[in-house]
Amino acid sequence: MATERYNPRASEPKWQKAWAEKKLFEARNDDPKPKYYVLEMFPYPSGRIHIGHTRNYTMGDVVARYKRAKGFNVLHPMGWDAFGMPAENAAMQNKVHPKEWTYQNIATMREQLKVMGLSLDWAREFATCDVDYYHRQQMLFLDFVEKGLVTRKSSKVNWDPEDMTVLANEQVIDGRGWRSGALVEQRELTQWFFKITDFAQDLLDSLEGLDEWPEKVKLMQQNWIGRSEGLLIRWPLASDVAGEHELEVYTTRPDTIFGASFMAVAADHPLAKKAAETNPALAKFIDEVRHMGTSVAALETAEKKGFDTGIRVVHPFDDSWTLPVYVANFVLMEYGTGAIFGCPSGDQRDLDFANKYGLPVIPVVMPEGGDAKSFQITEEAYVDDGVMINSRFLDGMKPDRAFDEVAKLLEQKTIGNRPMAERKVNFRLRDWGISRQRYWGCPIPMIHCEDCGVVPVPKADLPVKLPDDVDFDRPGNPLDRHPTWRHVKCPQCGRDARRETDTMDTFVDSSWYFARFTAPWAYEPTDPRAANEWLPVDQYIGGIEHAILHLLYSRFFTRAMRATGHVDLAEPFKGLFTQGMVVHETYRVGGASNNGRWLSPAEVRIEDAEGKRRAIEIATGEEAAIGSLEKMSKSKKNTVSPEDITDGYGADTARWLMLSDSPPEGDVEWTDDGAAGAHRFMQRIWRLVSTAAETLAGVKPAAADSGEAGAVRKATHKILKAVGEDIEKLGFNRAIARIYELANVLTTPLNQVAEGKADPALQGACREAVEILVHLIAPVMPHLAEECWETLGGTDLVAERPWPAFDPALVVDNEVTYPVQVNGKKRGDLTIARDADQGAVEKAVLALDFVQKALEGKAPRKVIIVPQRIVNVVA
């Protein structure tokens, strides 16, 4: 009888080696079984992973192992999203080359992931900084150029004058560069763009067909694409400004035109620039605006400011009515025409602006049934539906009808021999700017020639490799100052030319990697046959923070790759799941006001003093403040490394805990107590199986219909069916709860087996039940499952065995319980044979004591029976 404790440190490496030797997880493209592609968003090799990172990999692994057992040819690959700024920062701070830093981190993190026992196809591994990978990315780029999906144009960017680089909107904090602290400038730079707007309508329409995506993600993408139907109105200028006669404004609410009290233009609008030429104060204001972040979020949170240019426009329906034109810091040139008309009564931002600058507020929409004479707007705009007021010929109309009426009338009026207005569909989505003034990224394969212009690098000359001999001793892009790399001959005329020194946005790298995994050995970016067979990804797993950009860019890429013949599909991901985070409390000594030090969980001990938890820094004995539960992050040091758990408890404990306590879409709190509890259950499973194994090893699974053996079989098969359904729905915590239930069911029978007290029928039922238990735990605790199977006499691996099939006859209850109501109020229940007819149900209900008491000896007026559901007695 085996009674030793299960030793994960000995067991887990043994089974990982066994799986690797048999290459169980290497998918074959020619396998005739039905395909299933499960993928977790691949990691950035930042140095080390923490336990929070592994939660989504564990989720994907459970699905992969389950689907293999169900007979699918499963592709479950892993790679590295390896380009990006952190490597350059490390190069500057630590005097280490980005390539060396990146590949060292990959080696470390690969070993960390392998310790977790993930069933990954490592044969397909690649990093996006591998020359083989970015060579194919350059091939795609040139195909996109040829197809007209790439353009080069001027765009406003956040420029850090100290680091001499473009910053993403998220890297601008309070108007300063996140790293240098320098005041950020808005500059016009000529950059490369992917024409994602060519697919805007399709990207929007196709969201409807993504049935296995979270609704919130689809809504976020819908809002980002931002389709609107509106009117482009040409407002006449009261007097010409440097040859300009009109101001074009796009609006989705032309019905509110009689509520207009001002116009606002972006700081870089042509009208603003011309007005600033003769107005130094305006020029200074425009310069201030240019030091703000360019993101919509930055503009929404910033104080709304404006500057009256002195320019006036004439109202389209009243020549005697003029409105002031302001330069405003909340208007972006990239949206619409870079100009808006402000209707304060119907928009809160416009109302705040009008109140700040003393502009008129004219209510033009009020609730139906309201009093137009008394209806006023002061501090809160009215943004709901209603009826038009104070709008002359529009009064009494609904806004939709007023929209059409304004459009019809202005389309008939002319200004400069053109209609004063035209209907227009607008999108918030903008073309994707991919230029980055950085070294550690995929080089853009273009060449600048003074005679031929910008020409592509011939495919035969690819890849354009990054030079290794670069230095990071000063800010800016090392490629710009490389003595030889950027000097090249023009492929068209042969004269001296220079390479493009911008590299691609790292979002490009992650926008097609899922396709490369289908045939990473192919010379072309994809093997179309393999890509079309494997794609779309059946289950994609990753954080909600990627709901917009990464997922939208990937959807664009599959469309662009279809247009260029690399794949024959539009949508990359069939099913999408956004998992919650692993959170941990924080510890800090010194406090926020004193720039206190963050401590890692390993640096503190938790004490219980008079019922209150205290954190003590081990090294100093100083008390640390215990903070709230937060996402694990290096900056606050509240991370737990996988080794902290696997060295003591084993990988299966970590896997079990991450999936057991919370729904997978919710956050899970990592605690030492939780880890200890998961480990205790692992040991309990081992004891249950190993103590009965000596007897059960020689027993064959046997069917039983009655007695204790029948009850064991029935409970086991019902749980088997339920666990399969739970995993299919990614309800991992529910599946685990049912495994706990099965362990409880089997505790007494297995103890009887171990003690020699079980008859042959119970032994046969227990052998079958234990086999099922082993297979049920295998997706979550695969190492323990293999150890249990070996102990039971198994000679093969659980990882290559099929998922057990439940007996349909055992999962159907022979009885049904009806809630019984009297006059619509529940009084009790009736349990009766499931196949009882309505007459038998009615007879049994009327015989119940609480029903007879309610009827007081009288016959019921009616008995309503909803089969298999509910009974209502009407007295």
UniProtKB/Swiss-Prot annotation:
Its main location: cytoplasm. It comes from the Bacteria. ATP binds at residue 634. A motif ('HIGH' region) lies at residues 43-53. GO terms for molecular function: aminoacyl-tRNA deacylase activity; ATP binding; leucine-tRNA ligase activity. Keywords: Aminoacyl-tRNA synthetase, ATP-binding, Cytoplasm, Ligase, Nucleotide-binding, Protein biosynthesis. A motif ('KMSKS' region) lies at residues 631-635. Belongs to the class-I aminoacyl-tRNA synthetase family. InterPro entries: aa-tRNA-synth_I_CS (IPR001412), aa-tRNA-synth_Ia (IPR002300), Leu-tRNA-ligase (IPR002302), Leu_tRNA-synth_edit (IPR025709), M/V/L/I-tRNA-synth_anticd-bd (IPR013155), Methionyl/Leucyl_tRNA_Synth (IPR015413), Rossmann-like_a/b/a_fold (IPR014729), tRNAsynth_Ia_anticodon-bd (IPR009080). Its EC number is 6.1.1.4. GO terms for biological process: leucyl-tRNA aminoacylation. It catalyses: tRNA(Leu) + L-leucine + ATP = L-leucyl-tRNA(Leu) + AMP + diphosphate. PROSITE patterns: AA_TRNA_LIGASE_I. This is Leucine--tRNA ligase. The keyword Protein biosynthesis applies. It comes from Mesorhizobium japonicum (strain LMG 29417 / CECT 9101 / MAFF 303099). GO terms for cellular component: cytosol. CDD domains: Anticodon_Ia_Leu_BEm, LeuRS_core. It is found in: Cytoplasm. The gene is leuS. It holds the Pfam family Anticodon_1. It is an enzyme of class 6 (ligase).
